[in-house]
Amino acid sequence: MSQRKYFGTDGVRGEVGGPVINAAFALRLGYAAGRVLVRRNASRQGGRPQVLIGKDTRISGYMLESALEAGLSAAGIDVVLAGPIPTPGVAYLTRALRLVAGIVISASHNPYQDNGIKFFSAEGTKLPDEVEAEIEAALEQELGCVKSEDLGRARRMSDSQGRYIEFCKSTVPHSLDLHGMKLVVDAANGAAYHIAPHVFRELGAEVYAIGVSPDGFNINKGVGALHPESLAEEVKARGAHYGIALDGDADRLQMVDASGRIYNGDELLYAIVRDRMRQGKVEGVVGTLMTNYGFELAMGRLGVAFERANVGDRYVLEQLLARGWQFGGESSGHLLCLDCHTTGDGTIAALQVLAALHANKASLSDWIADLRLYPQVMINVPLQPGQDWKTHAGLAAARAGVEAELAGRGRVLIRASGTEPKLRLMVEAEDFALAQASAQKLADSLG
């Protein structure tokens, strides 16, 4: 794939008012994407192509939505405005309404000062690389406008949230009845603020909701999946059975039990996979380079194949599709259940966990008791300009020694930071002291 100027691994993202997240660029991006989609759907019957736009609750969403809408209309695309809705909700509605593409305006777990724009295909999956490349090329052309009779229209979709709520509920058996269960749901003042509490209430749970008062500036601020400690306190204070924390665009999940214990993505994925094993539905699972070694060992004990992808749910999805598997995720809480949805979905993942516990009459701590996560130690070492750590003899020797010592009892991961001149040295081992000593050996070898 050729070098991209604008698109990263998760669409276009940056600080509002910066080079790419501004009204002028969004207008151009809407027009460029619109021209590509019109050309690719020239033989489509039934009028102009339609594109869905959804967003989270950032103040900049209004500006970017209007600019994208104008650009798409100028290219001859009809626009459906879904309003605030989770990223996976855009994927679902794009597919359900047979639209040619979906657009999400969100920077996920980032603060309100950032925003992003990413695309879904008509199938509710990430836009193919070749289509992104065509949009990049179209961005280099002048902004134009189709003839007046070919301009696109825009309409607001009044029932987008209700449709998505029903879809979420449809992913669990009708026998799942949450009456008698008390939940705290934290929507991070983000896209799921109206949706997530309703999903669990309509299945019978008593729900106390936090992070459901967005003001355009408080998305992810001290709440949500990046701050599960506040949820843990709420769960204990209210005597709830579980807490559910989503991030700003609701594609990430963390959970808390009645004792205040926080469960990360590895633990929640294990809960889902173990239940699907009971149903005979698991061929393999994809994690990432950061997935805990204890999870890998647990998959081995279950007899489930396990593979690691690069960090990022996009890469997990690519491996799942390539292998024909259905389950994968990241420690951060991006969980994919492709038997339910085409993309990662925090609300649906939480439902799968609760359905597993309900079906097996188990608590979350008991259900994942066989999963033992290994202590992890990370040391960041500054890299000197021009220093090639891959050919550093001292580091290579230290790594060989550490890996020999840890054989079957841990692992080593060494990778350069993608944002700063640092080398990240990560060690997981049976006990913290061993992990810490091993990581320090690696760091000292670079001294």
Curated annotation (Swiss-Prot):
Its EC number is 5.4.2.10. One of its GO terms (molecular function) is phosphoglucosamine mutase activity. The modification Phosphoserine is found at S108. Its cofactor is Mg(2+). Activated by phosphorylation. Keywords: Isomerase, Magnesium, Metal-binding, Phosphoprotein. Binds 1 Mg(2+) ion per subunit. InterPro entries: A-D-PHexomutase_a/b/a-I, A-D-PHexomutase_a/b/a-I/II/III, A-D-PHexomutase_a/b/a-II, A-D-PHexomutase_a/b/a-III, A-D-PHexomutase_C, A-D-PHexomutase_C_sf, A-D-PHexomutase_CS, Alpha-D-phosphohexomutase_SF. The active site is at S108 (phosphoserine intermediate). SUPFAM superfamilies: Phosphoglucomutase, C-terminal domain (SSF55957), Phosphoglucomutase, first 3 domains (SSF53738). GO terms for biological process: carbohydrate metabolic process; peptidoglycan biosynthetic process; UDP-N-acetylglucosamine biosynthetic process. It comes from the Bacteria. It catalyses: alpha-D-glucosamine 1-phosphate = D-glucosamine 6-phosphate. One of its GO terms (cellular component) is cytosol. It is an enzyme of class 5 (isomerase). Pfam families: PGM_PMM_I (PF02878), PGM_PMM_II (PF02879), PGM_PMM_III (PF02880), PGM_PMM_IV (PF00408). The keyword Magnesium applies. Belongs to the phosphohexose mutase family. HAMAP family: GlmM_B (MF_01554_B). NCBIfam families: glmM (TIGR01455), PRK10887.1 (NF008139). This is Phosphoglucosamine mutase. It comes from Bordetella avium (strain 197N). The gene is glmM.
